[in-house]
Each structure stands twice: as structure tokens, then as C-alpha cells.
């Protein structure tokens, strides 16, 4: 495992750039932080680089196993100092593991193949809220998520943290325009249910047996 101690190291700078959407798009990668989420990424086989906080390699058997699994998959491993880890992530107290992960995005047709209920998010602006909604959808057994154009970037660090790993195993189609979504829903026999506050049926009295696309609007 190579040691990195300089915040000016090109590898460190490239990873730190992933805090910005422009570079996430250019590199087709994003950051995943924390043992649980990094473990999910390793299990998915999509970790490109793994940064380990210096002095924590053997902090627990679980962490050691994650590092070993990442190495076996061919990920680049780096042991970094705390200043370097702080440079890479956007939190004041960085966790022991941070990974650069290959960006994954589903196509609408992949969601159609799964059937069931699809959650459609429209212009969700807060990264934390977006991540929480994806995590909730995953826990509820939703088959996939559609992010309409105008939603904040799901690969932003705060959004990724809020998903707590769910982003890595629930299909998410991003940047979909409304017209394409409606055309796709009609083509694949989806009933569209839109949430609202007034003059609406109760969620608990509504038949949501698939295929149904539930649209939730902005904050």
C-alpha cells in the first residue's frame, strides 16, 4: 500500500476534484465515504481507488477484510495522512475509508424490466433530502428511481453519504426530461401517481400494485 502525505500529490488532487460535479462527469467517478458504504462499493466491484487513513489499516477485522477485498479486485490502495484525507473529502472529521468509485447510472429501460413501483423525483434541490429519499426507496423495496432534469446531483458527496450505500444497489436513472419520462411510462404501461397536499386520495387507500410511477415534487 503506497503512502501519500502531500495534499499536492496529483492522485490526491484528482480525488479531491470529485467534490465538484464538473470533474465527476469528466472522470465518470464519485466519492464514497465510510466503512459501510465503501464495503458496499467493494462488494459491487466498482472501487477504483481506496484511501485508508494512516494508522487504521488494522483497526478492525471488518476494515482489514474490506481493504483485502479491494486489493483482490485490483483497486489502487493508498494510506494517507489526516490532512490528505481532509483534502479529499468535504467533512471536518474524515472517516477511515474513502473510495473513488466508478459512476453508475441506469437507463429507463432497465427500470421497466424490473416492473413494480418506480419513484420519480422532480426538482429535489437539497442533496441530503435526495439521498434520504433514495435510501428510503431502497428500504421500501422500490424497484428503481428516476431523477428528472432539475434534481440536484445524486453523486454529490452529501447526497451519496445520505444514501448510506443504497445508491450502489438500487437502479437510478438521472437527468431524465419530463417528456421522455411520460413517453417511457406510457410505452411500458406505468400508471403515474402524483403526490400533492390538497384534493388528493390517501396514500393508504390507493392501489399501488405495479407498474406504478410515484412522482414526488420539490421541497
Positions of PLM-derived features:
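Active-site/ligand-binding-proximal alpha/beta "capping" segment
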Residues: 193-219
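RNA substrate-binding interface of SAM-dependent RNA methyltransferases
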Residues: 46, 83, 106, 110-200
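Hydrophobic residues in beta-strands of the RecA-like P-loop NTPase core, especially within AAA+ ATPase
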Residues: 34, 121, 216-217
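Acidic/glycine-rich phosphate/pyrophosphate-binding loops and surrounding catalytic core
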Residues: 92-113
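Short, hinge-like loop/turn segments at secondary-structure boundaries
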Residues: 67-69, 95-97, 162-166, 191, ...
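N-terminal positively charged helical leader segments and presequences
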Residues: 1-90
Amino acid at each position: 500500500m503506497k503512502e501519500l502525505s502531500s495534499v499536492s500529490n496529483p492522485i490526491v488532487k484528482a480525488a479531491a476534484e470529485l467534490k465538484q460535479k464538473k470533474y465527476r462527469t469528466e472522470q465518470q467517478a464519485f466519492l464514497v465515504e465510510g466503512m459501510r458504504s465503501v464495503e458496499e462499493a467493494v462488494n459491487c466491484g466498482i472501487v477504483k481507488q481506496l484511501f485508508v487513513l494512516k494508522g487504521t489499516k488494522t483497526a478492525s477485522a471488518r476494515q482489514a477484510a474490506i481493504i483485502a477485498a479491494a486489493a483482490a479486485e485490483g483497486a489502487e490502495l493508498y494510506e494517507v495522512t489526516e490532512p490528505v484525507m481532509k483534502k479529499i473529502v468535504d467533512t471536518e472529521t474524515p472517516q477511515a475509508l474513502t473510495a473513488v468509485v466508478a459512476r453508475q447510472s441506469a437507463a429507463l429501460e432497465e427500470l421497466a424490466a424490473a416492473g413494480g413501483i418506480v419513484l420519480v423525483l422532480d426538482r429535489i434541490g437539497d442533496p441530503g433530502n435526495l439521498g434520504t429519499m433514495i435510501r428510503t426507496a431502497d428500504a421500501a423495496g422500490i424497484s428503481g428511481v428516476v431523477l428528472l432534469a432539475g434534481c440536484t446531483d445524486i453523486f454529490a458527496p452529501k447526497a451519496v453519504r445520505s444514501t448510506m450505500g443504497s445508491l450502489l444497489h438500487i437502479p437510478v436513472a438521472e437527468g431524465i426530461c419530463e417528456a421522455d419520462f411520460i413517453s417511457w411510462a406510457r410505452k411500458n404501461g406505468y400508471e403515474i401517481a402524483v403526490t400533492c397536499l390538497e384534493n388528493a386520495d390517501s396514500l393508504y387507500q390507493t392501489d399501488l400494485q405495479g407498474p406504478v410511477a410515484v412522482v414526488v415534487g420539490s421541497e
